[in-house]
Amino acid sequence: MRRLRPVELDFARSAPLRLTFSARLGAPPSAVYAALAEDAEGWARWFTGVAEAVPTDGGAGREVRLTGGTRFLETVLATEAETRYTYRVDRTNAPGLRALLEDWRLAPDGDGTRLRWTFAADGPGPLRLVLLLARPGLGRAFRVSARALDRRLARAANGS
C-alpha cells in the first residue's frame, strides 16, 4: 500500500475536490454517532461497498476493505460526540490518490438527524475528473447506505 499525504481537518474545506452529500435519518444524533464512531465492524452491514472495517490502535484508526479489494488504513482525526466523526486515509492501494479525508457531520433535525458526508480528495487532474464523474454513483451509494443505517438503527431501537 502507498502512503498518502497526511492532511488535517481543514482539508475538508481546502481539498482540490470536495463532494458533499446529506440525508435525514429518523434516529437521534447519539445513535447515528455511535454507529459511525463506535461500531467500526458494523459499517460492513450498512455502508454500500464496505466488505470489512476493523478498529486499529485502540479505536484511533481503522482498516477498511471495500468489496472490490481496495484497502484503506485510516487515522481518526475528530470524534465530537453526536456532531462530528472525521478520518483521513494514510495508506491505500487505490491508484492516483494523493490525499483523502472523510468528514461526517451530524445535526439534530426534529426527532432525527441530518447527516452530511464530505469526501475530500487530492490527486492528479484525471483522477479528480473521474471522481467528479463518479459523483452521481457516490451520491446514490451514500443515500442507499443512509437508508440502510436508518433501518438498522430503527430495528435496534425497537429491540429487534
Residue ranges of predicted features:
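Hydrophobic ligand-binding cavity/cleft-lining segments
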Residues: 1-57
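Amphipathic hydrophobic-ligand
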Residues: 96-103
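Short, low-complexity Ser/Thr-rich regulatory SLiMs
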Residues: 78, 104-110
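A conserved amphipathic terminal alpha-helix motif
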Residues: 1-4, 121-160
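Glycine-rich portal/gate segments that line the openings of hydrophobic small-molecule binding cavities
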Residues: 24, 41-95, 114, 147-160
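Short, solvent-exposed aromatic-acidic interface loops
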Residues: 90-94, 118-125
